[in-house]
Amino acid sequence: MRKTLLRFAFIYLTFKILMNSAAYAQDPGFSQFYANPLYLNPAFAGTAKCPRILMNYRNQWPGIDNSFITTSASYDQHFDAINGGLGLLILNDRTGEGVLNTTNVSLMYSYQLEINRRFSIKFGAQGTYMQRSVDTDNLRFGDMIDPRRGFVNLTNEPIISESTSYFDASAGILGFSEKFYFGLAVHHLTEPEESFLGRPSPLPRKYTAHIGAVLPFGIRAEDMSWSPNILFQQQGNFQHINLGVYANKGPLVLGLWHRIGDSFIGLVGIETDQFKFGYSYDITTSTLSNKAAGSHEISMRINLPCPPRKVKFKTISCPSF
């Protein structure tokens, strides 16, 4: 019974978010944010030495019946002819047992500018087609409840449209040297309208800042490194700060993060020249910890053969997760 009430409360909250999305709207997030670089910052398009395919899966709060499931796939490559990179990102976010579904298809372009022999800057631009749909058959409201028979009444909550779509734009910048890197990105520059109810409901801009370093460790520095990182994101009334560190020893990668006020994140991964796989688990520390059961995240990357290259370009040295 308690689980049923919890499901009802979550589904009802999902709808209230739809009704007041200007105040509550928030993009899905990944704990392994460097494992989904194009989603983090469009300037990452084409930053790898060779073409790559990346896939990501996140199951957030599975204790509430798979309430948030996000999947993504991307491809990006550097092209000498344009002195930059191109990327494609497809993302699907499923909320509230399929009550709300969001699908994004994004194209990215980045341009690389070498400031000197040690430092480069990349500028990125992104265009996105977004589609959102709501499954009204699975929505549950307080006025639908009969004390004896359960959810049998019709609701008076108004829903004008069951789907909406729009175009969006984002931009980012990335600076990097051999050991250090930083980036800034702004998503939803146009703040597109996304309401299902015919009332003003713009999607708030998302601001991202990230900075880190990859530093050698030990006598044989080529075998082991550690990477401290900071991530800050703000979107509407939401903001969070991630503080963490990665450690690499041969193909093994370990990571530990703290999302301030929300969770601790542990990661284990394997990385080779052709393949990368990582698993992370969020230990929720907020008030949802007893019911949410944390979050699971899986990432995978496949490096494709490098095309013949006439011009050398600098690649960024940053964590893969």
Regions found by a protein language model. Name each.
Residues 9-20:
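Bacterial N-terminal signal peptides
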Residues 2-3, 17, 214-217:
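Short regulatory "switch" loops immediately downstream of catalytic or recognition motifs
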